[in-house]
Regions:
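Surface-exposed short loop/turn segments
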Residues: 70-115, 121-137
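Exposed loop/turn and edge beta-strand positions of beta-sandwich/beta-sheet ligand-binding modules
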Residues: 33, 65, 95
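Sec/Tat-exported extracytoplasmic proteins
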Residues: 54-58, 101-105, 150-159
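C-terminal/domain-edge helix-coil "capping" segments
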Residues: 130-161
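A structural "domain/chain start" motif
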Residues: 2-11, 15-59, 159-161
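Short, solvent-exposed, polar/charged sequence segments at loop or secondary-structure edges
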Residues: 46-86
Length: 161
């Protein structure tokens, strides 16, 4: 009797967790059909985020790979959305980064002159500059993760021979 009650409670709790969006870490990680890739990029926080995303997607980074990913430098731009002189101001932060994908054997472009773009809106306080800078930096870190995920999605759609 006690065992069936415990099993029933366990089933109800797992259903409740799944219903509220709880997922085990790594369960729905994207996987790429590209087993190996040569990453050609300057060392930067964005290129490191892309490297991490590729490795998490099951792609090994190797200089001898058949496919080369050319990743340009990220560009961060900010656009003020509100015009108040004091207090808080709403700002749109946008990250853009160019990339292309080439075959190593003949340098043919599989994806040429592509652009990654991710943006978010943040509320920056003019009263507390430190917290505003922290909010901005966290937004940029999230944009890097979003752009890396966007790149994984584009590479996943790529048909490679």
């Amino acid at each position: 009797m006690r065992r069936t009650v415990l099993a029933g409670l366990m089933a109800v709790s797992l259903t409740a967790l799944a219903g509220c969006g709880f997922q085990l870490r790594g369960l729905n990680q994207p996987t790429l059909a590209i087993p190996e890739l040569n990453l050609n990029a300057n060392v930067s926080p964005f290129s490191e985020e892309v490297r991490r995303a590729l490795e998490n997607a099951g792609t090994r980074i190797s200089e001898t790979a058949d496919i080369r990913l050319n990743l340009g430098d990220e560009r961060i731009s900010e656009n003020r959305l509100t015009r108040s002189d004091s207090g808080s101001r709403e700002t749109e932060v946008t990250l853009t980064a160019p990339f292309s994908v080439q075959r190593e054997s003949d340098d043919a472009y599989l994806l040429n002159q592509q652009q990654l773009e991710a943006s978010t809106t943040v509320l920056l306080s003019t009263d507390d500059i430190y917290s505003g800078e922290e909010v901005r930096n966290e937004a940029i870190r999230q944009l890097r993760r979003d752009a890396a995920t966007q790149l994984i999605d584009r590479l996943d759609a790529l048909e490679t021979p």
